[in-house]
Regions:
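Nudix hydrolase/Nudix homology domain
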Residues: 2-13, 77, 88, 122-123, ...
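Conserved Nudix-box catalytic region and its N-terminal flanking loop in Nudix hydrolases
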Residues: 8-11, 47-49, 53-98, 146
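Acidic, metal-coordinating catalytic segment for phosphate/diphosphate chemistry
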Residues: 17-54, 60
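Active-site-adjacent beta-strand/loop module that shapes the phosphate/pyrophosphate-binding cleft
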Residues: 29-35, 120-140
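Short loop segments at secondary-structure junctions
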Residues: 36-38, 59-61, 70, 133-138, ...
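A short coil-to-beta-strand element that immediately follows conserved catalytic motifs
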Residues: 107-114
């Protein structure tokens, strides 16, 4: 596809009402919306969750920091990359640095922002702010304060691919991050140095 994408009209929000709220973790809204063709949808539901940062972190010798932890939403143990939600007033990069330290005890020498991606376009959900951190080194003990127990693993890229093929990554965001960073073209062209 070249040139400008085709134009699509935006839906007009006529009314919004809160259905459920559990701040800061979850808000469900019902919207009345007018479609470009004139139809009106009386109950379009939106779910809002907090934005988060997720990091693909490589040590100086090229191993990747991976967490093995129970994820109650899927009721299973999964491999994940370090990640976490924003604190009030925090920007994406500050969140990424804080979460890396809290969950692993590591800091990174170099950072690249890989962009902001919405996790569920039809319901909004939240946005994932992705980062590639390199030259990571351990400077402290992990102290995340999270509900989940975490086991920190140092894996090669080949081990990550094998784990993904075996279904050890339960979340699409993790597979997307792995593909984005390791793709021979995208991995070198997406993002900017922070």
């Amino acid at each position: 596809m070249t040139g400008k994408p085709p134009k699509h009209d935006v839906w007009k929000v006529l009314e919004t009402r809160d259905v459920f709220a559990a701040p800061p973790w979850l808000k469900v809204q019902s919207q009345r919306v007018a479609l470009p063709d004139g139809r009106v949808v009386d109950d379009y539901h939106r779910v809002t969750l907090p934005d988060y940062a997720m990091m693909f972190c490589e040590t100086e010798d090229g191993r990747v920091l991976v967490l093995r932890q129970y994820k109650h939403g899927v009721g299973a143990v999964s491999l994940t990359f370090p990640a976490g939600t924003f604190n009030a007033g925090e920007d994406a990069f500050t969140c990424a640095q804080r979460e890396l330290m809290e969950e692993t005890g590591y800091v990174a020498g170099e950072w690249r922002s890989l962009g902001r991606y919405v996790t569920h376009a039809n319901a909004y959900g939240n946005a994932a702010h992705l980062f590639h951190a390199t030259d990571c080194r351990k400077v402290a003990e992990a102290n995340s304060g999270d509900l989940e127990e975490m086991e920190l693993l140092l894996m090669t890229r080949e081990e990550l691919f094998a784990a993904a093929a075996e279904g050890q990554f339960m979340l699409t965001s993790q597979i997307g991050m792995l593909a984005l960073v390791t793709h021979p073209i995208l991995g070198k062209t997406v993002g900017k140095k922070v």
